[in-house]
């Protein structure tokens, strides 16, 4: 099964927030100043990069979406540099010029890969009339599919509630990367995207997954949010929505060099994907993949459609990820030629929890490749009842495919995967629970082919049914 990229070329997104210019001066140091005990830097390279809300807009434009940027600037060289640089990457700027204030600029002096000093040129925009910002939002609402509010607490978003109200009245989702601990100002937003530190600063330290979910759901209720996405660095990200099961997506980063601007990439991809007509769950999947790409780059970076496509399709195209039966047979044949031991397991995996993750990791350790066969929606309904599955097949497979322990994910329509197993004939068939080996579907076929069958224990205290019951109980309070 292939995962298609969103139609970014049809997506329109407006970003409103704190715009700033990042300046970098590089050069060698070879002596100490006679005027003071400080190094003398002979500047030989100057770089200018859009920062803050401008970096979010660049991330949206880099995907091929229509990005509009609104913010407050001075009338100065920094504002002109921002406009020029952003125009070159197809970001449409509609700045509100404030003659009494400088454009927010952060100047960094670096030598030998060390930052020696940072100079900030800024005055708070808190007292500036927000009406011109409201007018620009109103003018764009008919042609955008999402509004991003990028808050760096520099004064552009003193009237957040008015902005949220304007967008919601027009049916446009509002995504906010929050700043500080006053989430009351974001009341009524469609989606907040705090990182774990920001989340815990408001909700309190979370000692377990259940506690994070419980406190996140309380924030959603307290501030009338439609959803909350907590980004958790190497632990991936967790999406929470009222009356829905938590969706946890493991990180896809292979190497982490720099997390600078990763939050801008996440909210930019989320907004562009939603504006293209995709679901929030799909938007989180693409944002998670993009974050895995951008943290592998040095400095503030963006993600191109090709890079995103490689991130979400690369595993399948090179023999990994979500597959059709035919693709799986070819991948298994190639693995056997390389002398690799193929392990196979199956299940519904409706709400992925710690027990599932631990079980799959243990199964993967038993061989070189792990296949996970997943019950289709119809098969799950017959097995678990009319209220299941909670998460549709495609989403269940996408999340499983993102796990480091899982190599291949395939679906089956029957009540058991016996036919599928007979066609694959893994070297080791694994099942979790209280089964006897001879009771496991496909065991006879695997034994007849000289393979092994094994039962692994599930982690105690983890149950999809219990999670669903807890969510239902909480929603009834």
Swiss-Prot record:
Keywords: ATP-binding, Carbohydrate metabolism, Kinase, Lipopolysaccharide biosynthesis, Multifunctional enzyme, Nucleotide-binding, Nucleotidyltransferase, Transferase. PROSITE patterns: PFKB_KINASES_1 (PS00583). The active site is at 264. Residues 1-318 are annotated as: Ribokinase. Coiled coil: none annotated. ATP binds at residues 195-198. One of its GO terms (biological process) is ADP-L-glycero-beta-D-manno-heptose biosynthetic process. It holds the Pfam family CTP_transf_like. Changing residue 236 to E: In mutant SL1102; heptoseless LPS. Pathway: Nucleotide-sugar biosynthesis; ADP-L-glycero-beta-D-manno-heptose biosynthesis; ADP-L-glycero-beta-D-manno-heptose from D-glycero-beta-D-manno-heptose 7-phosphate: step 1/4; Nucleotide-sugar biosynthesis; ADP-L-glycero-beta-D-manno-heptose biosynthesis; ADP-L-glycero-beta-D-manno-heptose from D-glycero-beta-D-manno-heptose 7-phosphate: step 3/4; Bacterial outer membrane biogenesis; LPS core biosynthesis. The keyword Nucleotidyltransferase applies. It is an enzyme of class 2 (transferase). GO terms for cellular component: cytosol. Residues 344-477 are annotated as: Cytidylyltransferase. One of its GO terms (molecular function) is phosphotransferase activity, alcohol group as acceptor. Catalyzes the ADP transfer from ATP to D-glycero-beta-D-manno-heptose 1-phosphate, yielding ADP-D-glycero-beta-D-manno-heptose. In the N-terminal section; belongs to the carbohydrate kinase PfkB family. HAMAP family: HldE. PANTHER family: BIFUNCTIONAL PROTEIN HLDE (PTHR46969:SF1). This is Bifunctional protein HldE. The lineage of its organism: Bacteria, Pseudomonadati, Pseudomonadota, Gammaproteobacteria, Enterobacterales. The gene is hldE.
């Amino acid at each position: 099964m292939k995962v298609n990229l969103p139609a970014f070329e049809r997506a329109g997104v407006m970003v409103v927030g704190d715009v700033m210019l990042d300046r970098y001066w590089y050069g060698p140091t070879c002596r100490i100043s006679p005027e003071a005990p400080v190094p003398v830097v002979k500047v030989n390279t100057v770089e200018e990069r859009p920062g803050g809300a401008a970096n979010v807009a660049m991330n949206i434009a880099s995907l091929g979406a229509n990005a509009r940027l609104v913010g407050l600037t001075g009338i100065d060289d920094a504002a002109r540099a921002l406009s020029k640089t952003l125009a070159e990457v197809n970001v449409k700027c509609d700045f509100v010029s404030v003659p009494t204030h400088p454009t927010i600029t952060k100047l960094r002096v670096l030598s030998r890969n060390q930052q020696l000093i940072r100079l900030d040129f800024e005055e708070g925009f808190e007292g500036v009339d927000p009406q011109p910002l409201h007018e620009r939002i109103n003018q764009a609402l008919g042609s955008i599919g999402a509004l991003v509010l990028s808050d760096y607490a520099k004064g552009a978003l003193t009237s957040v509630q008015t902005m949220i109200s304007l967008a919601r009245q027009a049916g446009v989702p509002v995504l906010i990367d929050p700043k500080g601990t006053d989430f009351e100002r974001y009341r009524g937003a469609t989606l907040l995207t705090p990182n774990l530190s920001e989340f815990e600063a408001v909700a309190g330290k979370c000692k377990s997954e259940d506690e994070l979910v419980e406190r996140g759901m309380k924030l959603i209720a307290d501030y009338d949010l439609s959803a909350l996405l907590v980004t958790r660095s190497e632990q991936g990200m967790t999406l929470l929505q009222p009356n829905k099961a938590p969706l946890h997506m493991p990180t896809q980063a292979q190497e982490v060099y720099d997390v600078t601007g990763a939050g801008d990439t996440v909210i930019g991809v989320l907004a562009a994907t939603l504006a293209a007509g995709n679901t929030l769950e799909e938007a989180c999947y693409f944002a998670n993949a993009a974050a895995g790409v951008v943290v592998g780059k040095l400095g503030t970076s963006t993600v191109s459609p090709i890079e995103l496509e490689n991130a979400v399709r690369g595993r399948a195209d090179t023999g990994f990820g979500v597959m059709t039966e035919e693709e799986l047979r070819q991948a298994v044949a190639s693995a056997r030629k390389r002398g690799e031991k193929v392990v196979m397991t199956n299940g519904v995996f409706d709400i992925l929890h710690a027990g599932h993750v631990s079980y799959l990791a243990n199964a993967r350790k038993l061989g070189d490749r792990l296949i996970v066969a997943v019950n289709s929606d119809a098969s799950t309904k017959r097995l678990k009842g009319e209220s299941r599955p909670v998460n549709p097949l495609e989403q269940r497979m996408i999340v499983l495919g993102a796990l480091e322990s899982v190599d291949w994910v395939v679906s089956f329509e029957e009540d058991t995967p016996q036919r599928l197993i007979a066609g694959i004939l893994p070297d080791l068939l694994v099942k979790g629970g209280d089964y006897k080996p001879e009771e496991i579907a496909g065991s006879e076929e695997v034994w007849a082919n000289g393979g092994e069958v094994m039962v692994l224990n599930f982690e105690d205290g983890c149950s999809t049914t219990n999670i669903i019951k807890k969510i239902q109980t909480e929603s009834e309070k």
